[in-house]
Amino acid sequence: MSTAEQRLRLMQLASSNLPVGGYSWSQGLEWAVEAGWVPDVAAFERWQRRQMTEGFFTVDLPLFARLYRACEQGDIAAAQRWTAYLLACRETRELREEERNRGAAFARLLSDWQPDCPPPWRSLCQQSQLAGMAWLGVRWRIALPEMALSLGYSWIESAVMAGVKLVPFGQQAAQQLILRLCDHYAAEMPRALATPDGDIGSATPLAAIASARHETQYSRLFRS
């Protein structure tokens, strides 16, 4: 696959039109807004930076790197172990459901894009979108850092678009937020990918509480 094709594939994976349900979940933000924890744009940016620093950089990216390497080596046992670890790090039923739902949706795309994906790997990808992204990145020969950029941009854009609906704020403010959050992501991503095993784990108790409370929130825009 040429470099141009690989870049276009990365754009497709980061696209908001990718039908994996990324815009259906707020990861607790909806309850945090109702509780008054995130009343404005500045508070939203602080909230999202904290989720990135204490969650995405310490759980998602380190585990994505391990899943990618397991896929490179064809080590299904290691990939299963790290996927189970990822699900264990999702601290609420809502977050685990999101992970599995997005994984199942991505696996359906994977079946169309790569119908020769072996059944054990396809079954694993149904449990987590990270596993599917890792397998596909290896199959398409896209390097880990580039896949991590696509993954991060998709996560940032989904979070900001949830903020537009909930906080709320306008599209111009949203684009400024995406710019600043992407700069922070790009600066810290290499360190996150190199996280040692012993440092994997989240430290976002308020986000976990918000997600748990969102499960029974009376009026909701986002899934639970």
Swiss-Prot record:
The Gene Ontology terms for molecular function here are: nickel cation binding
A GO-annotated cellular component: cytoplasm
Q: Which InterPro entries match?
A: UreF, UreF_sf
The family database entries (Pfam families) matched by this protein are listed as:
UreF
The record's subcellular location field reads: Cytoplasm
Whether Cytoplasm counts among this entry's keywords is yes
Q: How does it assemble?
A: UreD, UreF and UreG form a complex that acts as a GTP-hydrolysis-dependent molecular chaperone, activating the urease apoprotein by helping to assemble the nickel containing metallocenter of UreC. The UreE protein probably delivers the nickel.
Q: What does this protein do?
A: Required for maturation of urease via the functional incorporation of the urease nickel metallocenter.
The family classification in the record reads:
Belongs to the UreF family.
Can you say what this protein is called? Urease accessory protein UreF
Q: Which organism is it from?
A: Klebsiella pneumoniae subsp. pneumoniae (strain ATCC 700721 / MGH 78578)
